């Protein structure tokens, strides 16, 4: 039992470091909405590329949901499901009162949601930039095992 507790703790540490690295790597250049991105809402427009990076490091699947904002507008949103649990590191981009459904995979003819997201060249570019920044940040934290 002690071995599984140690593994869980290591996984929790990795997730903490990854979340810290992501939040410190988000910029206007990694956002899908550069015009409305601000340092006050750094998660804005980061959901697809963040879900891809989380998938790289933690596995699981990428999920899509049509988020309903308090004013009734619907916004496309991606997050992760890992070991049956929702992991949404960009939920904070939405105002209080936004409703994010449980979501589904979004493939649109591709074999996975990941492949669908990466079929967009601009998203691919933003993903590569974010992943590079995250890798550099993790190295600064002394994380060499990933």
Q: For each predicted feature, which ranges?
A:
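A structural boundary/capping signal
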Residues: 1-146
């Amino acid at each position: 039992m002690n071995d599984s507790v140690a593994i869980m703790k290591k996984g929790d540490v990795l997730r903490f470091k990854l979340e810290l690295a992501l939040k410190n790597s988000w910029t206007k250049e990694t956002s899908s909405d550069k015009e409305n991105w601000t340092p006050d809402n750094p998660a804005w427009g980061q959901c697809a590329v963040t879900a891809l990076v989380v998938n790289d490091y933690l596995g699981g699947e990428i999920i899509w949901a049509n988020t309903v904002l308090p004013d009734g507008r619907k916004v496309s949103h991606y997050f992760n499901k890992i070991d049956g649990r929702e992991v949404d590191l960009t939920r904070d981009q939405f105002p209080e009162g936004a409703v994010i459904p449980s979501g589904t995979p979004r493939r649109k003819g591709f074999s996975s949601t990941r492949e669908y997201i990466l079929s967009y060249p601009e998203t691919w570019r933003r993903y590569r930039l974010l992943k590079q920044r995250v890798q550099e940040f993790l190295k600064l934290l002394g994380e060499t095992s990933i």
